[in-house]
Swiss-Prot record:
Ca(2+) binds at D22, D24, D26, K28, E33. Residues 9-44, 80-115, 116-148 form the EF-hand domain. Potential calcium sensor. Keywords: Calcium, Metal-binding, Repeat. This is Probable calcium-binding protein CML14. One of its GO terms (cellular component) is nucleus. Disulfide bonds: none annotated. One of its GO terms (molecular function) is calcium ion binding. The gene is CML14. The lineage of its organism: Eukaryota, Viridiplantae, Streptophyta, Embryophyta, Tracheophyta. InterPro entries: CALM/Myosin/TropC-like, EF-hand-dom_pair, EF_Hand_1_Ca_BS, EF_hand_dom. PROSITE patterns: EF_HAND_1 (PS00018), EF_HAND_2 (PS50222).
Amino acid sequence: MSKDGLSNDQVSSMKEAFMLFDTDGDGKIAPSELGILMRSLGGNPTESQLKSIITTENLSSPFDFNRFLDLMAKHLKTEPFDRQLRDAFKVLDKEGTGFVAVADLRHILTSIGEKLQPSEFDEWIKEVDVGSDGKIRYEDFIARMVAK
């Protein structure tokens, strides 16, 4: 961990992202780019949160990477992985029962976005207790995934 509470991997990712946004190569980015940069690093600040950061931190002119690191250490709040998983499962759990149908999950994970191969899904679903009704309790699955 670095002195500001960020891991070396985080600092490295932040440096890479910062350099991408430093389009003129002067080692600085504009305060107006802070939001998109934070989002590219896994944060999800609202516009009002960004305005508050810009005001509180007195960001009236372009700032350098060290200042950016300081800002990230103070203000970057990434969504925990378990919350991301839970939110994704809740989309499938329209009645709010805590369960999702394996068939629905299979369809989505093998046909949308970064598709799993059906064989990959079959391996993945072995990690979960599937009920006789063909559904899984997603909190159990999330607990297993987070523990790995």
